């Protein structure tokens, strides 16, 4: 059994002041996972607001200067150089105002980043932090198993692949819940595997590596078949569960369809 695992990491640094969740808890998208002390980021936001206000005042002043120089130039009282100087000063202040507004936007974002929320529905695992801990941007503090993303990788012999077609119904049985099977559908069949005989070079992890059962007998290769779960399973699903799948009137439902993922 497999699923998408989302690593939860802050986008800013600081001490954690609140963790309202616990390990192995089910959460919904939008639930607060943890909060970083916002004090420094509130101060930075106030400073950015003040900088924008100051730059806006400077721009207004430079606009007035430019308007005056424009009028004087039209009356042939001011030189073109003085007019150009006023233009350049106004353009410089406008650029600084744009930078100040960008800093303000970033300060607003950083303050918002002090609260980290669940991006999807799922189950928390490996929560390895606590209030008071100082964290850095990008530190993965916990993992969130996406509860809507469970799928199965079943390894079938290449001799069985002609009978395995996308959208074919399969019966799924999870070890420990053999009396509660449920259905799924074939999603896709892998287009390649890493050859263990060395002819494929060194594994890069881009192709699935499937171990042969007996080295001295030429056995059919096994290819991963991705199976999606249809409907709501009657049992709790966990990454790494041992699963047996039986494809409708096609391949053998036992060892050939056995999929065990660490």
Question: Where are the predicted features?
Answer:
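A structural signal for short beta-strand/turn segments enriched in small hydrophobics and glycine
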Residues: 16, 24-33, 69, 100, ...
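Long, amphipathic coiled-coil "stalk"/hairpin helices in large membrane-associated assemblies
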Residues: 1-51, 75, 81, 119, ...
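Residue-level detector of conserved, well-ordered beta-strand and adjacent loop positions
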Residues: 9, 37, 84-87, 117, ...
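Hydrophobic alpha-helical membrane-insertion signals
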Residues: 128-130, 136, 140-262
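Elongated periplasmic alpha-helical coiled-coil
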Residues: 4, 11, 17, 42, ...
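Alpha-helical coiled-coil segments
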Residues: 40-109, 127, 152
């Amino acid at each position: 059994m497999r699923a998408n695992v989302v690593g939860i990491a802050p986008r800013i640094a600081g001490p954690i002041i609140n963790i309202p969740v616990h390990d192995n808890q089910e959460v919904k998208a939008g639930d607060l996972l943890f909060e970083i002390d916002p004090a420094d980021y509130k101060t930075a936001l106030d400073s950015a607001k003040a900088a924008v206000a100051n730059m806006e005042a400077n721009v207004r002043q430079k606009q007035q200067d430019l308007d005056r120089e424009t009028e004087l130039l039209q009356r042939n009282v001011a030189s073109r150089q003085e007019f150009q100087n006023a233009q350049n000063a106004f353009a410089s202040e406008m650029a600084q105002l744009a930078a100040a507004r960008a800093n303000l936007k970033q300060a607003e974002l950083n303050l918002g980043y002090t609260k980290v929320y669940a991006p999807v529905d799922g189950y928390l695992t490996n929560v390895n932090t606590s209030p008071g801990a100082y964290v850095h941007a990008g530190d993965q503090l916990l993992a969130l198993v996406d509860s809507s993303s469970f799928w199965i990788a079943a390894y079938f012999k290449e001799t069985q692949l002609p009978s395995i077609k996308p959208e074919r119904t399969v019966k799924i049985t999870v070890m420990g819940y053999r009396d509660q099977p449920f259905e799924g559908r074939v999603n896709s069949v892998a287009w390649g595997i890493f050859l263990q005989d060395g002819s494929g070079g060194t594994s890069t992890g881009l192709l699935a590596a499937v171990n042969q059962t007996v080295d001295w007998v030429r056995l059919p290769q096994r290819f991963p078949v991705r199976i999606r779960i249809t409907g709501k399973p009657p049992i709790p699903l966990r990454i790494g569960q041992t699963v047996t799948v039986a494809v409708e009137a096609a391949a053998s439902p036992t060892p050939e369809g056995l999929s065990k993922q660490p």
